[in-house]
């Protein structure tokens, strides 16, 4: 409902905003779209948002349970966001629609049916969550945006706590957690670690079927 509310408000705000569904547009139209804005030095904006379920879900097994965060986050020119709660979902979908770059919004299908309290601030039509900024609660960093990644916030947390644990639903090899660990190793926060960084990931196997 938060995603729908965000889209409804943006459709009402800007007459140029519209929706397209699967296989209703001309074939091949979306290919290579991610580089257009960058390659034109910002002269040709590509304000398009791709929404879709991401990660494990009940009863869909290996065919439909992949985590695409690392896949899309690997592509220069794309912005990748991943909301956790209703506040994230509404604020990020509105920011994504207003962005001049193509944005991929990865939505956890298990969260669609979960009720979250929506703060009064988030109920405003002007509510936005900036892409590229994390959410922090008790040193738990809700990354929200996969690309661009707010590495400065992660570094600040490591320098404060002297520890790093990454948690993701995707596979361990070449994942988002691996990227975070690599950036910490390459940056100023590495010398603040009191212990090796730890990654918590999905198992390195296709997702089994379960209801």
Swiss-Prot record:
Biological processes per GO annotation: glucose metabolic process; pyruvate decarboxylation to acetyl-CoA; tricarboxylic acid cycle
SMART domains: Transket_pyr
Binding site for K(+): 48, 96-97, 99, 101
Main location: mitochondrion
Documented EC number(s): 1.2.4.1
Subunit structure as annotated in this protein's UniProt entry: Heterotetramer of two PDHA1 and two PDHB subunits. The heterotetramer interacts with DLAT, and is part of the multimeric pyruvate dehydrogenase complex that contains multiple copies of pyruvate dehydrogenase (E1), dihydrolipoamide acetyltransferase (DLAT, E2) and lipoamide dehydrogenase (DLD, E3). These subunits are bound to an inner core composed of about 48 DLAT and 12 PDHX molecules. Interacts with DLAT.
Protein name: Pyruvate dehydrogenase E1 component subunit beta, mitochondrial
Taxonomic source organism: Mesocricetus auratus
């Amino acid at each position: 409902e938060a995603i729908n509310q965000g889209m409804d408000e943006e459709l009402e705000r800007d007459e140029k905003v519209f929706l397209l569904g699967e296989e209703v547009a001309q074939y091949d139209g979306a290919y290579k779209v991610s580089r257009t804005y960058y390659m034109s030095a910002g002269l040709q904006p590509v304000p398009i948002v791709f929404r879709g379920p991401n990660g494990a879900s009940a009863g869909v097994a290996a065919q439909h349970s992949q985590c695409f965060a690392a896949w899309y986050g690997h592509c220069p020119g794309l912005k990748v966001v991943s909301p956790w709660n209703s506040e994230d979902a509404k604020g990020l979908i509105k920011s994504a629609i207003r962005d001049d770059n193509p944005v991929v919004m990865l939505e956890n299908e298990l969260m669609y049916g979960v009720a979250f309290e929506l703060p009064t601030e988030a109920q405003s039509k002007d509510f936005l969550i900036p892409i590229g900024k994390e959410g922090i609660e008790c040193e738990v960093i809700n990354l929200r945006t996969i690309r661009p990644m707010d590495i400065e916030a992660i570094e600040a947390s490591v320098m404060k706590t002297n520890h790093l644990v990454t948690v993701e639903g995707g596979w361990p090899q070449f994942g988002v957690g691996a990227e975070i660990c690599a950036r910490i190793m390459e940056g100023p926060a590495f010398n603040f670690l009191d212990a090796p960084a730890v990654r918590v990931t999905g198992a390195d196997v296709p997702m089994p079927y379960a209801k």
